[in-house]
Amino acid sequence: PRINRIRYLAEEKIYLRNNSPTSIINWFEKYPPLGGLGKIKLAEAYLEQGRTEKVKELIKEGWVTATIRKNDLGYYRAKFKKFIDSDDHIKRADYLAWERKYWDLKRMLKYLPKDQRALYNARQILMSNSYGVDNAISKVPQYLKEDPGLEFDRLRWRNRRGRLDGSLEILYRNSLKTEGQMVRPDKWW
């Protein structure tokens, strides 16, 4: 029972400094990566062997969803800078925001383009109940003000503060969207 959980946790313990690239690749050929971090570790092993065609696909998939410790974020970003770009950072920031991982999101802000940084900074402040909500939202460019994630975080923030009229306004505005237009409809209540 729970063998996948054990495998997922094992992926976090695999490091190149303790294992050869070949042994890491062999492990993941037998047990395909379950999480984003596993994909990153496999990509790292392929990179050590110069097999860059495999690296790009794995790193782009793994980067978005990986649970990366604070100390490892800069290391992986530097190691894979040829393979990940600002779009990948934006996808990661979006994933972290929707998953409510606001401390990880805060660490990602410096890697985002200016407009996206303003958007995700506002979302992070709303999620973490930090001060400066109005100021952060005012810095979000107009074309991003109706971002579904920002709308969702504003709805939750207003609801927590008992601002039901404001909550209902956002909820109504978004209820007019079709399911295809909504982002993460599973998160809205």
What are these regions (language model features)?
Residues 1-189:
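Alpha-helical solenoid repeat scaffolds
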